[in-house]
């Protein structure tokens, strides 16, 4: 009953956004709008919104898949914009969410089959062109769309906004689970949808404080078929044109996996990286605000689905926007051209006590860096308040010229752990003359079977970023052992000692002193 009521409310909102029913009937718009239920093979009904051009077909098709927790009308603004450009648009809620029946499978086999079912329905019930089909989505819809391109050769283009390529890598990095992001997804999924028994089991298992090796392996195996990298051979065989747009500071799906995916794709491709957090760059466009992110989607579909404007194909396929603030985009012919040469910073010995938190942290999932996308200001920490008993802190001399960080920072620590298990979190800051650090990047690392008192090598590969440190500022590295974002393995306190060789490699372009 509640879901039905939401469906009615959503339809009323769409009437307001797209124009009254009377206006539509009078031909005030170049397309008609209707709401349908698309029957899936297993009897599940998928709630969908269909925008069909009034002109004679056949029309290029744009299938828009809802994000986590969303329904058919979540993409109403992009749907209208695509319909205005002559597309037959079918926007639907993924099963288990919105107006759709069934249960949330997290990009399971049924979710992937649903994409083909929606395409089948469009071809059978509208003037859709089977040779011109594109699929797009934000977050959850992006992940489903990428995998579907490997299952259905009719999909000629994909727009993946804040999506993932490797689900296991998204859930955990360096033996450290993204606990707070996982909790947000679990609770929002429960509140806004119907989780399948398997999804419920895996997500609750993932949130167990001290996960067993067997349960960890079970989650990895569950994640594999839900990851585009597992279907890369079929995706490349079908050669869809793939557009990925990712934020630098993703707390759900870090951008490094999208770099790897881009480099592995053999068909037409484009990758854009912008400041912000999960889904922040596309949110304005979903609300009807001007959006360069959605403009790229429309142009990508025009080139590779409708065939009406191929100008985007003549541009450099790698687009990056540096932090902080709003900087002009930098374009590159390939990823190698986008990144800088590493400069090594040798770190002197240090030690601190494990198990106590400090003001250094990665922020709040989906909020902290979304605010940065709006204001241009990264999250900050006042470094003089970071206790040297609870963290190791290294700082460079103030810069005489700007430092243009481009690419992935790399670190190596040689530590002597006090216990068999433990976690460290490394933060890299841009620090001003007052000691206020703006967060450039961060990364956790956990060990679960170390020999106490014996040196342990820790290698960290941060997600890539583009960040310009102003002249007069300095780079600082802070390492502590607690962060609300992560489920750590610090079961007891003890002194963690850093010794040589320990270093941080910073990739820079055109930077001196």
Residue locations for each model-derived region?
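Gly/Ser-rich "nucleophile elbow"/oxyanion-hole loop immediately N-terminal to the catalytic nucleophile
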Residues: 55, 105-111, 117-139, 155
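Short substrate-entry loop that stabilizes the transition state in hydrolases
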Residues: 55-59, 64-101, 251-254, 485
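Accessory cap/linker subdomain of secreted extracellular hydrolases
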Residues: 84, 136, 147-237, 308-312
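Short alpha-helix in the alpha/beta-hydrolase fold that links the catalytic acid
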Residues: 240, 253-262
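Glycine/threonine-rich phosphate-binding loop and adjacent beta-strand/alpha-helix elements that clamp
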Residues: 29-32, 36-40, 308-513
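Short beta-strand/loop motif that positions the catalytic acidic residue
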Residues: 238, 243-246
